[in-house]
Amino acid sequence: MGQVTVYRDTAVVLRVTKLGEADRIVTLLTRRGGRVRAVAKGVRRTKSKFGGRLEPFSHVDLQLYTGRNLDIVTQAETLDPFVPVLAADYPRYTCATAIAETAERLTAEEHEPSLRLYLLVVSALRALSETRREPSMILDAFLLRAMALAGWAPALNGCARCGEPGPHTAFHIPSGGLLCAVCRGAGAVGAARPAPASIELMAALADGAWPVAESAEPAACREASGLVAALLQWHLERGLRSLPMVDRLGEFAPIAPPSVFAPIARPSVQADPESDRSVGSGGSDGTVGAALSDGAGVIQAADLAVPPVPIVIDSYATVDAPDRTPSGRAAS
């Protein structure tokens, strides 16, 4: 980028990192440009022109210009005030942190357009800030749909290996979902046997069937969350730093994904170009991020026609979270 170019884009701040005495590097997931890292000069000064608009989870409209190594943020305006609500609520804060970290991990290349992921992240943060749904369910719905966007949608109806229609009882993380009896006996070491209610919950979260999801028992919620976390860890090849801190259904209980996986080749997932569902559209109606939140939070398929463009990204845990005691209760 030899020539300086000024451009505008909307973005979610995923992460911030200190730079020198007054600056920050912000990692952004932009609507048109994917993941971008940029410098916000003077943002840590008391009288900074950016105020608090470049904190993690901020949804902002930005003006930037291209730099030699990093772009430079010159203007920032808040689009959605997610930060105050999320920073004041520990369960929602930790879920937002996991969402931001996942989004950054799924965008390996900078300036690679990731419009669907951007829309999904905005929808998830909006749902968290509206405080109408259980935050851990919103997180699991986001993770399932984000994995589907990456081509890693778990097999929750048929066999992950041969496609034999279910119901099946064995769930094998390395194979990518449920296995029939024949495939389970063909070297699927370490397959779990989750309760049918847990699989039903995962399918409901992936499809946006919130009445079904919200009627699930706590035991099914915890088991489904463990399976989702283990699937994500398998595909990313290491766990998220933020996920063990997520407050599950009001109980501060870090998730411990299975540590032993069978030495089986990863499944090759082929996306069907004719099906939005194959790329993790999220809802049976073809919307991306459908039912993560209602109203403005639902992303319509028409939004996907927007041409992709650059983005900016960096750290995700700089906003002060509420103090937490070892028992998981907020400190008084």
Model-derived regions, located:
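Non-catalytic alpha-helical scaffolds and adjoining flexible linkers that form interface surfaces
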Residues: M1-R277, D285-V288, D294, V298-S332
